[in-house]
Amino acid sequence: MDNELDNLISLLQKSKASLKEKHGDRIRSIFAAHHSGSILPKEDKSLYDKCLATVDLLDEVQQMLTPPLHTLIDGFFGFINSKTLLCAVEFGIPDALSQGPKSIEQLASSSPQGELSPHRLTQVLRTLTGIGIFNYDKTSKLYSNNATSDLITTAHWSKWVYWTKFYPTEFYDMMRFLPDHIKANASRTAAQSNYNTDMEFYEYLSNSGLAKEFHRVLGAGATAQLPGMISDFPWDTLGDETVLDLGTGSGEFLFQLLENYPRMRGAFMDIPSTISRIQAECEQPGGRFSGVRDRVAGFHAGNFLDEVPASVVYTIKWCLHNWSDEDTIKILQNIRRAIVVKPEARLLIIESVLEDGRTGRPARYGDIIMMATCNGKERDIENWQAVCEQSGWEVVKSWALRNSIPSCLELRPI
């Protein structure tokens, strides 16, 4: 075993040095090459996937070699990462560093929230630099942003900064009630217990005034992940078919597809109030979606649990994880009955696919969040295949999407 570990240490040291010195700029470009609404470079996809495969393999090795107590300690104190990240954003550290490297004294004295303790701020930033958020140069004793902390500046187009302010607060409080929720006789979700209500989660958001902030956070995440969604499935193979987006929400996803694929046509379906807003954005001069109005084939107000309009191609994004398997099968059956069967016919589900490994963590986090809020869930590929087969569909491929938590499941009618 000594020789194995010596060889592994030597190999990792050499690989780390080579990647940093010879390929550092290339690695940074692979992860930085995404902008709002833009198509990602196709030539980067293979390297991106290899990076993630390497991360998963290294994570397996790390788990083998990590003392069990160290693993438990990460479980005991995982909340510290969330709360120190919240502190950094609340006190404007990423924004301050966007102007250039700074000392701890400069950061402590320039916070928009008032002067901070340099010593205590050092403790917070030591935790964050240790997990790859921010850089610290021991020689100059200066902090700087890195590719990760750049994402949480207020000026960054992705607005991931909204997530750092919402999840470590609202959802942090909610998770205190997770043990009660797991009990077989639980009558309330963790969210209902946290807010002391019997209202469903989304109903409570609307009635409490939290809905606006919640949808701002989710909307930011959706926008941030759009480049991978519109780049890593071959949408151009759909030609001039009409894509009907079910549960369209903000409408931004379909709008970006139409913007980037000029032969494509699209249609929206959601509840009446959402469709009214989207239709106005399409038809009013200067509206957000007015530039693609000539390729919008319809605005459909309704409930996909009842029925859906006929179409050759459907998309549904971040909806089915809210529903039980029984309701999901009902929705998929409605789409199967309505689809116009021809060679191009398909349903594209953009949802998380539960997987093991380091890169599977985001979906596993999402699975707990869906349970805690609305008794929903994410699904592994076997679960997806089961609900799809029971409703008349075959999952022909799961497409991995860059810089995105979900995958794109391609379904064909059977």
UniProtKB/Swiss-Prot annotation:
One Gene Ontology biological process: methylation
Domain of life of the organism encoding this protein: Eukaryota
InterPro entries attached to this UniProt entry: COMT-like, O_MeTrfase_dom, Plant_O-MeTrfase_dimerisation, SAM-dependent_MTases_sf, WH-like_DNA-bd_sf, WH_DNA-bd_sf
Pfam families according to UniProt: Dimerisation, Methyltransf_2
Record GO terms (molecular function): O-methyltransferase activity; protein dimerization activity
Entries under CDD domains matching the protein: AdoMet_MTases
Chain sites annotated for binding S-adenosyl-L-methionine: 270
Keywords, comma-separated and alphabetical: Methyltransferase, S-adenosyl-L-methionine, Transferase, Virulence
The enzyme's E.C. designation: 2.1.1.-
Active-site feature positions: 321
Pathway assignment: Mycotoxin biosynthesis
Function noted in UniProt: O-methyltransferase; part of the gene cluster that mediates the biosynthesis of sirodesmin PL, an epipolythiodioxopiperazine (ETP) characterized by a disulfide bridged cyclic dipeptide and that acts as a phytotoxin which is involved in the blackleg didease of canola. SirD catalyzes the O-prenylation of L-tyrosine (L-Tyr) in the presence of dimethylallyl diphosphate (DMAPP) to yield 4-O-dimethylallyl-L-Tyr, and therefore represents probably the first pathway-specific enzyme in the biosynthesis of sirodesmin PL.
Record-stated family: Belongs to the class I-like SAM-binding methyltransferase superfamily. Cation-independent O-methyltransferase family. COMT subfamily.
PANTHER family linked to this entry: O-METHYLTRANSFERASE CICE (PTHR43712:SF2), PUTATIVE (AFU_ORTHOLOGUE AFUA_4G14580)-RELATED (PTHR43712)
Protein name: O-methyltransferase sirM
Species the sequence originates in: Leptosphaeria maculans (Blackleg fungus)
